[in-house]
């Protein structure tokens, strides 16, 4: 009734917008009728739902004049000719897009978004037959959401004319309620069935639909109430006395279930019932109220959380599992899957509960089927489905067809194909009656083993560059079946020969597995032969294989066999020991070379450090000489042209020019003339320092401040450049760029906002390109108080919906790569990896909407050539970052306990190298980490009891003059 009210309320609004009719109104209406095609169908569907089959004869229906008025109002702003031209252009554009989508689906039928876009465009163009076919194809591959089903049902209801059409709509409703638990679809189903109450068996049909709806979603605490009320209203409308008991029954059933607004339902029952409410009903009602209080925390948690609310649903499921009510457990699983239909673990848990507890064939198989339609890339769901079908006696042909679908599902790992083949082969093996020498089932099993090996070699190995079965598990199982169940050791030996030729001959466990099979089902001769081959080929544990051979000969062999075994084992072990010694010598030589290189680097650093110290010692004398010769500085420069003095802070201020003239010197070199003396240069540098404002950081404003780094050093006026960027996030109070003492921009700054939410929004601008470099935006955190604080905005774990692409050409742009990736699904995000200078590294991360699209993109794009570069595409799974171990004390051999070296925040600087031998080092206090730059090196105690007095610069100058 709400829909009818909304429809009738919109009519006067449309009339008021239409206004008086003009002379050219008929042309305008004709031009606008196509524009309102979709809207009129939607209104018709909603009106049909509310009014029943005879809606077009009622006064409240949407008449053609109403539609004309709406069309006139819609087209009042433009002339007929202009609108017709715009519409033709839009229609042509839509047709091209429809053709593109159809072609894309012919290539990849599992592209979910292409299906949705095609249905939307076909519906917009009014292609009713085509849109019905498109929906049918999509529903065969994917489960449809509640919105897609309701849209489809409304369109079909609007076109239904007779009883046959009504049966077709009933069939659609039956399919719709099987995909997900949808209270709204059940409500629509019940209301639509009421419209057919006049047909034969109509009343029973309505009651059947409502009863099934209550069984499915009647326990839904927040949405089940609407179904109960709709059912009661229907029964109340039937005024026969015999029907009153049915209404009583509905009230009593509803009041015994914990639902929201139970008090209002109880009050309504008291008002409706002429007789006093029975005591048993009141007791059930009070019990339901108590249960409601237990469920409320979980329901409120769902209301407060945002979709998909997986954690809240998991907690709710755990609670229901403890109570153990199968109906409520099934309901909460179904509710969780509506929002988390792409979570394989949730489907596995649900199907596992049904397999072990309920064991109802139709229910179990239905859930398994829905699971593989939602998550076709998860091999565990397929293997569980095969087991469930076998458990419930499904026909062999159906199971085989399901297995073929699994092979085309697009698994993301080679091992997944091995697992699904294993599940299918196990099923085929259980069908065989091995008491018979030959049977159809046995031949089918052998053919399946042969096909599995060919499939893994041709299909899987070409796609993933690996078979997924390095240990040849499938061939081992086949060999066991032939040996133990078929008594065919000849075939088993052939299989094991093939296993060994695939790189497994060097492993002792493989030979021992073969030996045990021969021991159980073969003969001594073949056992001895297998062990002799194992002794010659095994490289990982040859001693163990030799021991097994000697043990067998000790119990079963002759003297000659014993002598041969001893000779072979001794020869083999001697060769193995020789190889190990050579490998150890080679390893030792490499270690020695590394130590020599390290020693050379250490000496070079020591020499460099000593030279640096000498220069520091000569510093005071040089400065003194410079001060004494300031007046004759120009003459000294001419007399000693080989000496070059460092001019500090010689960068001129803005608007000034440097007063330096350059003249050609001897041998083509340039000699500077008319250069200011150092005293004037120092004065200029001091003035520059005074001009640079000191930046004082207020730590109390860290929550509204962000730290911006990796900016170009050449950026002029950072405040003016950055302010427009960050004002998009909110009001900027201040931008504090950091300059060096010479006035150079240091590439980072602080941006202070007025509100905290603006600062949080600014963090999303991290890695935004500014003058060709990625700008880093991070929270403002005092690292002296939080030394371990790090911000990495990207996940470092397995993300099945995200791809990692390597080998890209450096010239490939984001737009070009996005255009390539769009062909395989909806791209939510694409990130080209760059260095700090903004140069591409040939790597990229592409995030798709779901795991299915990502797996399809891997299969299609891996090995693709882009601008003569062959790219590699894989599911994003970054390696674990190395976490520095906690420092531990270590003890030198024969010496004192040594504390671990402590370095600053920037690692190990060259000036921290200690030239004191480790044996003489004493443990000292660990130096604190510095905020910027390395921490001070730990002090080393001198051998003397008292510390020597510090020497001044003059003392060092005297020592230097004594030389």
Swiss-Prot record:
Keyword Mitochondrion in the entry? The reply is: no
What is this protein's function per UniProt? U6 snRNP-binding protein that functions as a recycling factor of the splicing machinery. Promotes the initial reassembly of U4 and U6 snRNPs following their ejection from the spliceosome during its maturation. Also binds U6atac snRNPs and may function as a recycling factor for U4atac/U6atac spliceosomal snRNP, an initial step in the assembly of U12-type spliceosomal complex. The U12-type spliceosomal complex plays a role in the splicing of introns with non-canonical splice sites. May also function as a substrate-targeting factor for deubiquitinases like USP4 and USP15.
Q: Which organism is it from?
A: Pongo abelii (Sumatran orangutan)
Q: What are the Basic residues biased-composition ranges?
A: 620-635
Sequence ranges of Low complexity compositional bias: 1-11
Which keywords describe this protein according to UniProt?
A: Acetylation, Coiled coil, Cytoplasm, Methylation, mRNA processing, mRNA splicing, Nucleus, Phosphoprotein, Repeat, RNA-binding
One molecular function GO term is: U6 snRNA binding
Oligomeric state and interaction partners are given as: Component of the 7SK snRNP complex at least composed of P-TEFb (composed of CDK9 and CCNT1/cyclin-T1), HEXIM1, HEXIM2, BCDIN3, SART3 proteins and 7SK and U6 snRNAs. Interacts with AGO1 and AGO2. Interacts with PRPF3 and USP4; the interaction with PRPF3 is direct and recruits USP4 to its substrate PRPF3. Interacts with USP15; the interaction is direct.
Phosphoserine occurs at which residues? 10, 16, 215, 650, 769, 795, 852
Record region (Necessary and sufficient for U6 snRNA binding): 537-953
Region Required for nuclear localization: which residues? 600-670
Q: Which residues carry this modification: N-acetylalanine?
A: 2
Q: Which Pfam families match?
A: LSM_int_assoc, Lsm_interact, RRM_1, Suf
Q: Where are the HAT repeats?
A: 126-158, 164-195, 201-237, 242-275, 324-356, 359-391, 394-430, 487-520
Task: Map out region (Required for interaction with USP4) in residue numbers.
Answer: 487-520
Q: What is this protein called?
A: Spliceosome associated factor 3, U4/U6 recycling protein
Specify where the region named Mediates interaction with PRPF3 lies, as residue ranges.
Answer: 2-351
């Amino acid at each position: 009734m709400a829909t009818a009210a909304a429809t009738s309320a919109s009519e006067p609004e449309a009339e008021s917008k239409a206004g008086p009719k003009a002379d050219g109104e008929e042309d305008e209406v004709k031009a606008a009728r196509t524009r309102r095609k979709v809207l009129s169908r939607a209104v018709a569907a909603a009106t049909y739902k509310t009014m029943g089959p005879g809606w077009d004869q009622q006064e409240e229906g949407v008449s053609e004049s109403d539609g004309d008025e709406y069309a006139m109002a819609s087209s009042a702003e433009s002339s007929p000719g202009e609108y017709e031209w715009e519409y033709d252009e839009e229609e042509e554009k839509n047709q091209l897009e429809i053709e593109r989508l159809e072609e894309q689906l012919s290539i990849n039928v599992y592209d979910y978004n292409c299906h949705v876009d095609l249905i939307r465009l076909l519906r917009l163009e009014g292609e009713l037959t085509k849109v019905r076919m498109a929906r049918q194809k999509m529903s065969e591959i994917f489960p449809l959401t509640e919105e897609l089903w309701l849209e489809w049902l409304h369109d079909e209801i609007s076109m239904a004319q007779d009883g046959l059409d009504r049966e077709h709509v009933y069939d659609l409703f039956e399919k719709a309620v099987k995909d997900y638990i949808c209270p709204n679809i059940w409500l629509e189903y019940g209301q639509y069935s009421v419209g057919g109450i006049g047909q034969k068996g109509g009343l029973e049909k309505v009651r059947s639909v409502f009863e099934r709806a209550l069984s499915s979603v009647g326990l839904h605490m927040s949405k089940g109430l609407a179904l109960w009320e709709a059912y009661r209203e229907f029964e109340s409308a039937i005024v026969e006395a015999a029907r009153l008991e049915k209404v009583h029954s509905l009230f009593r059933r509803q009041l015994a279930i914990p639902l929201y607004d139970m008090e209002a339902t109880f009050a309504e029952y008291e008002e409706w019932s002429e007789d006093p409410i029975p005591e048993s009903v009141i007791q059930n009602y009070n019990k339901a109220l108590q249960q409601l209080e237990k469920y409320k925390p979980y329901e409120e948690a769902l209301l407060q959380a945002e979709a998909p609310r997986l954690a809240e649903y998991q907690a709710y499921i755990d609670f229901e599992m403890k109570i153990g009510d199968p109906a409520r457990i099934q309901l909460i699983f179904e509710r969780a899957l509506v929002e988390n239909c792409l979570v394989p673990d949730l489907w596995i848990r649900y199907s596992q509960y049904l397999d072990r507890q309920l064991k109802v064939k139709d229910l179990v198989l239905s859930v398994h089927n829905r699971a593989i339609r939602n998550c076709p890339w998860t091999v565990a769901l397929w293997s569980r489905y095969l087991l469930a079908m076998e458990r419930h006696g499904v026909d062999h042909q159906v199971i085989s067809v399901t297995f073929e679908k699994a092979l085309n599902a697009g698994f993301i790992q080679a091992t997944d194909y091995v697992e699904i083949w294993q599940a299918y082969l196990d099923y085929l093996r259980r069908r065989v009656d091995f008491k018979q020498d030959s049977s159809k089932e046995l031949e089918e099993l052998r053919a399946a083993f042969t096909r599995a090996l060919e499939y893994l070699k041709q299909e899987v190995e070409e796609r993933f560059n690996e078979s997924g079965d390095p240990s040849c598990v499938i061939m081992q199982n086949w060999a066991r079946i032939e040996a133990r169940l078929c008594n065919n050791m000849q075939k088993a030996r052939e299989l094991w020969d093939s296993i060994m030729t695939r790189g497994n001959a060097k492993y002792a466990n493989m030979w021992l597995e073969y030996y045990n099979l021969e021991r159980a089902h073969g003969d001594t001769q073949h056992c001895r032969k297998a062990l002799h081959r194992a002794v010659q080929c095994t490289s990982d544990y040859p001693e163990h294989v030799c021991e097994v051979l000697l043990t067998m000969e000790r119990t079963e062999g002759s003297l000659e066999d014993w002598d041969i075994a001893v000779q072979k084992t001794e020869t083999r072990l001697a060769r193995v020991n020789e190889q190990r010694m050579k490998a150890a010598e080679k390893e030792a030589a490499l270690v020695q070379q590394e130590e020599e290189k390290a020693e050379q680097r250490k000496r070079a650093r020591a020499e460099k450090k000593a030279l640096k110290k000498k220069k520091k010692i000569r510093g005071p004398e040089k400065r003194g000489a410079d001060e004494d010769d300031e007046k004759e500085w120009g003459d000294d420069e001419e007399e000693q042209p080989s000496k070059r003095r460092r001019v500090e802070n010689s960068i001129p201020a803005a608007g000034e020019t440097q007063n330096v003239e350059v003249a050609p010197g001897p041998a083509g070199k340039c000699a500077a003339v008319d250069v200011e003396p150092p005293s004037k240069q120092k004065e200029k540098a001091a003035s520059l320092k005074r001009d640079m404002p000191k930046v004082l950081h207020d730590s109390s404003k860290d929550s509204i401040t962000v730290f911006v780094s990796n900016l170009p050093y050449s950026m002029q006026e950072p405040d003016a450049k950055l302010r427009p960027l960050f004002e998009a996030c909110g009001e900027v109070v201040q931008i504090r760029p950091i300059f060096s003492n010479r006035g150079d921009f240091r590439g980072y700054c602080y941006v202070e906002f007025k509100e905290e939410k603006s600062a949080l929004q600014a963090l999303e601008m991290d890695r935004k390109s500014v003058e060709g470099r990625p700008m880093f935006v991070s929270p403002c955190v005092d690292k002296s108080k939080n030394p371990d604080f790090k911000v990495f905005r990207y996940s470092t774990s397995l993300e099945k919906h995200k791809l990692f692409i390597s080998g890209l050409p450096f010239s490939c742009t984001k737009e070009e790569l996005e255009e390539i990736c769009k062909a395989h699904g909806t791209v939510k995000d694409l990130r080209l990896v760059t260095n700090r200078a903004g140069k591409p590294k040939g790597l990229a991360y592409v995030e798709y909407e779901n795991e299915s699209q990502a797996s399809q993109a891997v299969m299609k794009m891996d090995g693709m050539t882009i601008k003569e570069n062959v790219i590699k595409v894989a599911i994003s799974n970054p390696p674990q970052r190395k976490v520095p171990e906690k420092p531990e004390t270590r003890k030198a051999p024969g010496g004192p306990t040594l504390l671990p070296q402590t370095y600053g925040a920037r690692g190990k600087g060259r000036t921290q190298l200690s030239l004191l031998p480790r044996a003489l080092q004493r443990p000292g206090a660990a130096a604190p980490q510095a905020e910027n730059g390395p921490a001070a090196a730990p002090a080393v105690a001198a051998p003397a009891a008292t510390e020597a007095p510090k020497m001044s610069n003059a003392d060092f100058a005297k020592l230097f003059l004594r030389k």
